[in-house]
């Protein structure tokens, strides 16, 4: 069975707790952000010496998955319980809540569920423990790209937990075989769109993080890297990948290959258009599969006429996708660091815990979960994630992301000179390494 998520990546989900799995330890408590102290914290301190327990601060989205993972740990570790503190579903609010706890030195959280792009920022501030000694436990077990997101300057400060990657959706009634190159995608999509009277391509083109991901996937597909291996300097303008990616987006917009309104389109806008039969190709996350196929109870004009494939590259070799997901880190303020370390390692490497993520529509980071699946699309996702790129978890990633949005979004629309725009991103990339 493939992913059957209850929402798209930008959707909203109820914050009411769902029942725990049968047999789960009763100790697990589910709280919402802003509802007072986390469980066990009324008297301060993240754990008691005679009753070691830890508090796991994690996103309120995908609540059922995290509940079940915590319940499984509690069943198998009755003397070292984990209690879950659910943060707000949105990334900005999550980050704010964790920073508030850390900057005030309240120390209410032992384990921090971090967006994959936050590792460098939290490590640079000294907020999370080094987990470098656990590297042998996850390398060869977790997806390589997921491990990359958990390190800053080649040192592990978190361990992989969940992931995400992109599919190329295409119309099987209009396209015989999925394209291997972006040029082939452009040419076949243009021809098929003209013949069918629809758009060639839909995806994430609004001025937000989705646009950054769309640009970076083209940039990486052209052979680019944002930083050197040690993350000490920007390599954004080395070679022609930066201009190749921007040129493709500019041409796709100018020629009408991108659907009308692409420059204000987010995930579910693209999904709705493709589901209505209004596009040849779509870049999107796996959540769209059951919606398009009708498995989620929605009407779909393409239920029998679409398939998924890896995103192409410019030279036709391999694939590249941006990685999403969460890593777990240990707070430097935790009073139960050893239990916290044990938990984050278990969550990364326990087959049962990782399988629970897949069952709840969250792509896991453990490679064997994909290899053992009978679902061809799920196995394909595993292959995609194995080659995926991590957005660099540098301290100033947020500022770099905003620079890409502010400079390259107008440039691809023909409203700004591409040369100075790319140079501005280069400066922002250098600044992102030094941001405090």
Residue map of PLM features:
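Extracytoplasmic/periplasmic substrate-recognition and gating elements
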Residues: 75, 251-257, 294-359
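A structural signal for short loop-to-beta-strand junctions that line the ligand-binding cleft
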Residues: 99, 108-110, 138-173, 184, ...
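Short, solvent-exposed loop/beta-turn-alpha elements that line the ligand-binding surface or hinge
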Residues: 133-142, 205-209, 224-244, 294-301, ...
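Long, aromatic- and glycine/proline-rich binding clefts that accommodate carbohydrate-like moieties
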Residues: 306-310, 356-403, 410
